[in-house]
Amino acid sequence: MIWLTLVFASLLSVAGQLCQKQATCFAAVNKRRKHIVLWLGLALACLGLAMVLWLLVLQNVPVGIAYPMLSLNFVWVTLAAVKLWHEPVSLRHWCGVAFIIGGIVILGSTV
């Protein structure tokens, strides 16, 4: 169950980062304060909840194991950047993502 909490904390953290990115997109396009405040508010809510979940994880998992698992954030953000904003990702970047996933699998299998 704690591993699901860790994954959910990671996803919420990423959602917060994506909301921040979306706020900057609105700022560049039409400078509507209402939209910027909405996206930044969502970012704060996601990041705040992620922090609470992260504290629960740290109560149950050694920090030396838990913290590297947050590398999942790089994977989620890369996938979202490609899907949502059609950002280009180089082969080198994808190789890095593969190494991150491999590292997470190795660390996760030792627990």
UniProtKB/Swiss-Prot annotation:
What molecular function terms (GO) are annotated for this protein? carbohydrate derivative transmembrane transporter activity
> Where is this chain's protein located in or outside the cell?
Cell inner membrane
Q: Where is the EamA domain?
A: 40-109
Membrane topology, from the record:
Multi-pass membrane protein
| Keyword Heme set for record | no
- Coiled coil, from the record: none
Question: Which ranges make up the Periplasmic topological domains here?
Answer: 57-60, 109-111
Q: Identify the keywords attached in UniProt to this record, alphabetized.
A: Cell inner membrane, Cell membrane, Lipid A biosynthesis, Lipid biosynthesis, Lipid metabolism, Lipopolysaccharide biosynthesis, Membrane, Transmembrane, Transmembrane helix, Transport
Q: Name one GO biological process term.
A: lipid A biosynthetic process
The protein's matches in SUPFAM superfamilies, at most eight in alphabetical order, are given as: Multidrug resistance efflux transporter EmrE (SSF103481)
Family matches, as Pfam families:
EamA
Which pathway, per its entry? Bacterial outer membrane biogenesis; lipopolysaccharide biosynthesis
Q: Does the keyword DNA repair apply?
A: no
Which residues span the membrane?
A: 36-56, 61-81, 88-108
Offer a single GO CC term for the protein.
plasma membrane
Q: Provide the primary localization.
A: membrane
Q: Topology: which residues are Cytoplasmic?
A: 1-35, 82-87
| Self-association state and partner proteins as the record states | Heterodimer of ArnE and ArnF.
**Protein family (similarity comment):** Belongs to the ArnE family.
Tell me the function of this protein. Translocates 4-amino-4-deoxy-L-arabinose-phosphoundecaprenol (alpha-L-Ara4N-phosphoundecaprenol) from the cytoplasmic to the periplasmic side of the inner membrane.
Q: What is this protein called?
A: Probable 4-amino-4-deoxy-L-arabinose-phosphoundecaprenol flippase subunit ArnE
**Organism in which the protein naturally occurs:** Escherichia coli O45:K1 (strain S88 / ExPEC)
